[in-house]
Amino acid sequence: MSPSLVTLNSLMYIIPILIAVAFLTLTERKILGYMQHRKGPNITGPHGLLQPIADGLKLFIKEPVRPLNASPTLLILSPLLAITAAMLIWAPIPMPYSLANLNLGLLSILAISGMAVNSILWAGWASNSKYALIGSLRAVAQTISYEVTLGIILLSTLVLTGGFTIQLLTITQKYTWLLTTSWPLTMMWFISTLAETNRAPFDLTEGESELVSGFNVEYAGGPFALFFLAEYANIITMNLLTCILFINPGPSQYPELFLANLIAKTTILCLSFLWIRASYPRFRYDQLMHLLWKQFLPMTMALCLLHASLSISISGLPPHP
């Protein structure tokens, strides 16, 4: 494949993701507005549809603030790493064909999402501000903690599937979703994705009343916009993964509808994220950690052992493709 074609393929992936992220922010503001008995953005363009474009332009033409004692290289590298990891994670995902057909597709997705934690840590340290550092440490502790349960839940589903490829998950769910056999894991996965993406009620990284906006307190303009884009891209990615793992459309009679089915289910899951934000108050930090280490972790480990022992005892391990 020629370099120009590779670039074109990458752009065909990245541009729709960025457009989806832009309109997810508008949808969030509209939904929160209607749930609070007020209108959301309705001035810029027809029914406020051009509001994300106006917000993006405003952020990117702002002058970036560079604190005097901050580390300038890391300060710029942190948002770049965040947005790069958020875009790179889409490579193994079939839409309907993947950009990189990897044998260990799901494992690579987990590894790339873990790499994004470094951007938060770098941002807090490079700002040379105690508020940013405390915010980044809290965010990193939360993200790393919930990645443990995400990894174990992923392992439990892969034991039933018999491989790490996303295509195999699609074939496995031809007759029934994994949601029907693993609904406790699905619920824990969904709650863990809320915590992993720093969404309400687990938005402790941006607790304005406690942390002065968290790890990105020294960021403004373009670098702040990159963090913002990465956060919302990760929300879409996690919901897409939830759909692939537990409610996969599968190879139905109409394979051409696979992508439309996947997008529709992902949209519903994204809307549920916004509904949860409008409905629930923020958890305390100790409640967040208690939920993971004392409830989710023992339950996921027990279910993982159950799935493995069940498959072995009835000789039901699927063959590797």
UniProtKB/Swiss-Prot annotation:
Q: What does this protein do?
A: Core subunit of the mitochondrial membrane respiratory chain NADH dehydrogenase (Complex I) that is believed to belong to the minimal assembly required for catalysis. Complex I functions in the transfer of electrons from NADH to the respiratory chain. The immediate electron acceptor for the enzyme is believed to be ubiquinone.
* Keyword Translocase carried by entry: yes
Reactions that this protein is recorded to catalyse: a ubiquinone + NADH + 5 H(+)(in) = a ubiquinol + NAD(+) + 4 H(+)(out)
User: How does the UniProt record describe the way this protein sits in the membrane?
Assistant: Multi-pass membrane protein
The cellular location(s) given in this protein's UniProt record come to: Mitochondrion inner membrane
Q: Which PROSITE patterns match?
A: COMPLEX1_ND1_1 (PS00667), COMPLEX1_ND1_2 (PS00668)
Q: Do you know which HAMAP family this protein is assigned to?
A: NDH1_NuoH
Q: Give the encoding gene's name.
A: MT-ND1
Query: Where does the chain cross the membrane?
Result: 5-25, 74-94, 104-124, 151-171, 175-195, 227-247, 256-276, 296-316
Q: Which domain of life is it from?
A: Eukaryota
The entry's protein name is NADH-ubiquinone oxidoreductase chain 1
For this entry, list what GO says about its biological process: aerobic respiration
- Annotated EC: 7.1.1.2
Keywords, sorted A to Z: Electron transport, Membrane, Mitochondrion, Mitochondrion inner membrane, NAD, Respiratory chain, Translocase, Transmembrane, Transmembrane helix, Transport, Ubiquinone
The similarity annotation says: Belongs to the complex I subunit 1 family.
Lineage per the UniProt record: Eukaryota, Metazoa, Chordata, Craniata, Vertebrata
List the GO molecular function terms.
NADH dehydrogenase (ubiquinone) activity
One Gene Ontology cellular component term attached to this UniProt record is: mitochondrial inner membrane
